[in-house]
Amino acid sequence: MIYKPYNLKDVVKASEQNKFTVVSTFAGGGGSSTGYRLAGGKILCVNEFVKEAINTYKENYPDTPVLPDDIKTLSEKDFSKYGEIDIFDGSPPCSAFSVSGAMVQGKHSKGWGQTKN
């Protein structure tokens, strides 16, 4: 198997195929979005509320709407207004949600909304 490095032009070209639609939550700088785009997916919108991650995402994909709110405040209507959703992707940060960590009962306090230095 030959490894082919991709650049952003390759990603944009592949995503123009529009084989399926995606909403991505906990989007970070766009890693999952890049994979979906390379597979021919169209990203309808993403959710991310960490400012540094939003800035990175917008730098990578300036035409994709970013919902900059805490996901706990969003509803299905906030996402579905961008079109019919084939894949709803969510990849929350493990340290804030893992039950093996020392979470405060009923709260996702450990690392929630914090950036790593």
What does each model-identified segment do?
Residues 1-117:
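Conserved active-site and SAM-binding loop architecture
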